[in-house]
Amino acid sequence: MTREELKKLPKIELHCHLDGSLSRRFLEARLGRTVLDEELSVTQECRSLAEYLEKFDLPGVCLKDEEGLEGAGYDVLHTMSQEHVCYAEIRFAPLLSVTESMNTERVIAALLRGLERGKKEFNIEYNVITCAMRHHSAEQNYQMLKTARQFLGTGVCAADLAGAEAQYPMSEFMELFQKTKDLGMPFTIHAGECGDPQNIMDAVRVGAGRIGHGIAMHGQPEIQRMVREAHVGVEMCPISNLQTKAVSGSSEYPLREFLDSGLCVTVNTDNRTVSNTSMTKELEFIQKTYGICDDEILLLMRNAAECAFAKEDVKNRLKMLMR
């Protein structure tokens, strides 16, 4: 497909962080000043994940009140509408926005108001994934997830675990996600983004419906088989992973390997603004770099419809679009 055809293609995105995907327009309006390119996005010269994460300081400041959260929800759907995204799951960590005057419930409700406004204006279906953070205590994370559970089916669709994977392995969170499962809340887990493939196995064993990144399965056919047989979706984010040096170079990135292994692979942006990317750019990149053909691009979209944390009627509509 040409770039224009890719842009017009109805697209599904399942792994998109709110704070890493806010537009320059939104950030400048909130901050009341011009924002420089180097404050917004990394370049190809990005040396590490630590350097990549520095870009999140600015958007974090803008998500500390209800007006900011509501505006952010609207803003991210506006951005997505410009490239024909028809369904998106937006993830964020509510506890990073909690203040003395704004509790978790108000944080989530504010974001949902903005997303609902965006849905009506731009005709994009959405859901929210609430992220537990690895550096927060088990009690903090569980209380947040209990609050998020109140919104399940009315804007929130699932939970996630994000943060420093190497420092806080999945084994430390098995009890938390067993409790999450007991709450009746589906979840995805950032696992195998860097380092230990054991985190992927633990995520699957505790009941994750999807895993974020999963690149530590590279060259691990037994783990790939485990993921495939458990029908666990794999949320891949090629451009972001190359920028953070999660792999040493594009030839080491296992997208083709995972597709050929029969995994339910999806392609996503991760952080639209920080990575200076879009779904169109991601698809164009994998076409050129990995020889992904048109039928495989449609397969990636059908996979996304299949493993979305959406209601069945929404999933069925998405599948019809991706035929």
Annotated model-derived regions:
Residues 1-185, 194-199, 205, 209-210, ...:
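Metal-cofactor-binding active-site regions of metalloenzymes
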